[in-house]
């Protein structure tokens, strides 16, 4: 089948008419499938809107054209839908998982998560997937009959297990919810969830290249250090010998996304043909993931990540901002712990001990945007780093 063409619904896809349901029973919609309702609920959530002002790599005020968690999530959803369409999967469920996957991230990207995890080291740590689950099952308060978004079982398991079965210690927030609504943490997630996870990898690689070029951290010609990118650039230069670097970079990103989507789709089709699943049940109980990069492409993808690690994520300019961002998160956590009156009224009401107090504080900080975290730091401290 040509890439981009919609395949018929596959028997191993998640069928909305056979969903395992919601924690709180609801009458069916007359106009939308259960998975479409899930997707719409994510889009209309407060947490989703906050992603507009949460960092991907560059802090929110560095430029209007850099990616935020929101634009990244939209791009992941676009890639995920393309893959789902090719494989005959449920596009609405796939989109739900792509849009929801970053809801639990704290401000300042991975720097904020590292800082919050250190602050919570004595209380179980901080995990953004567990935080996402808390958001969609408790923290969003938009409906009269339940807290959270009351998503389907399939959406919840995909949020928790999109990177595979949970092995080793399970974050407390996930374990507690799993005791109420068994998400089969030991098994793989649906193909829709596996697609969303690979789409996240593709989006990261391609769009961090785009942002790094825009920021001047490296050039198109620098990217020739990566063999796969060198081959793509050579083809671009052969077809468009007079193209300026801005358009060369944009064409490189487009071609890379197309190449990776086709590679993942082809590998998934090969694995599915070998495994011969006839239901989502078979997918979940398979010995390994059915959606993945082919081995040679996985090597190329690792090389891209290594380049970005050295030339972008470890760039002194980025590192300086991230160190300051970590300090801001740690400062806020320490001040809130020291003086609970600096938190909004009622935030610590009914706390049962030091661990619960720390967890409440981590929830408050995790919900902040970059901008609000800076505003809070200005309010509580005499000196706040300039994240530029």
UniProtKB/Swiss-Prot annotation:
This protein's record includes keyword Electron transport: no
Coiled-coil positions: none
Xref: InterPro entries: dGTPase, dGTPase-like, dNTPase_2, HD/PDEase_dom, HD_domain, HDIG_dom, PHydrolase_assoc_dom
Transmembrane segments: none
Region Disordered, residue ranges: 1-32
GO MF terms held by the record: dGTPase activity
PROSITE patterns: HD (PS51831)
Keyword annotations of the record: Hydrolase
All residue ranges annotated as the HD domain in the record: 69-205
Family: Belongs to the dGTPase family. Type 2 subfamily.
PANTHER family: DEOXYGUANOSINETRIPHOSPHATE TRIPHOSPHOHYDROLASE-LIKE PROTEIN (PTHR11373:SF43), DEOXYNUCLEOSIDE TRIPHOSPHATE TRIPHOSPHOHYDROLASE (PTHR11373)
Name the UniProt record assigns to this protein: Deoxyguanosinetriphosphate triphosphohydrolase-like protein
């Amino acid at each position: 089948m040509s890439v981009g063409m919609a395949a018929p619904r596959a028997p191993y896809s998640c069928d909305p008419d056979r969903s395992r349901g919601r924690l709180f029973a609801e009458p069916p919609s007359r106009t939308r499938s259960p998975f479409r309702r899930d997707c719409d609920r994510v889009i209309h959530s407060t947490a989703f809107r906050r992603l507009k002002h949460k960092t991907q790599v560059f802090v929110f005020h560095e430029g209007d054209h850099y990616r935020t968690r929101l634009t990244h999530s939209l791009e992941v959803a676009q890639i995920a839908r393309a893959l789902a369409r090719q494989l005959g999967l449920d596009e609405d469920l796939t989109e739900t998982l792509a849009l929801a996957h970053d809801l639990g991230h704290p401000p300042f990207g991975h720097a904020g998560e590292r800082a919050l995890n250190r602050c919570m080291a004595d209380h179980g740590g901080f995990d953004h997937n567990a935080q996402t689950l808390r958001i969609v099952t408790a923290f969003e308060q938009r409906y009269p009959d339940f807290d959270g978004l009351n998503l389907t079982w399939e959406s919840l398991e995909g949020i928790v297990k999109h990177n595979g079965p949970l092995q080793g210690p399970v974050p407390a927030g996930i374990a507690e919810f799993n005791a109420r609504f068994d998400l089969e943490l030991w098994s793989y997630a649906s193909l829709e969830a596996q697609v969303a996870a690979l789409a996240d990898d593709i989006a990261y690689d391609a769009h961090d290249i785009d942002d790094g070029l825009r920021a001047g951290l490296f050039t198109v010609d620098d990217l020739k250090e990566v063999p796969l990118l060198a081959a793509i650039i050579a083809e671009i230069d052969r077809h468009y010998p007079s193209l300026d670097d801005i358009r060369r970079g944009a064409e490189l990103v487009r071609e890379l996304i197309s190449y990776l989507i086709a590679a993942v789709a082809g590998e998934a089709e090969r694995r599915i043909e070998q495994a011969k699943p006839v239901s989502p049940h078979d997918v979940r109980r398979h010995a390994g993931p059915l959606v993945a990069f082919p081995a040679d492409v996985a090597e190329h993808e690792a090389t891209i990540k290594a380049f970005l690690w050295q030339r972008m994520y470890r760039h002194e300019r980025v590192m300086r901002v991230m160190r300051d961002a970590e300090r801001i998160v740690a400062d806020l956590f320490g001040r809130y712990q020291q003086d609970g009156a600096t938190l909004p009224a009622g935030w610590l009401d009914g706390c049962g001990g030091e661990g619960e107090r720390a967890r409440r504080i981590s929830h408050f900080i995790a919900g902040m945007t970059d901008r609000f975290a800076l505003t809070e730091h200005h309010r509580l401290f005499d000196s706040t780093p300039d994240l530029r």
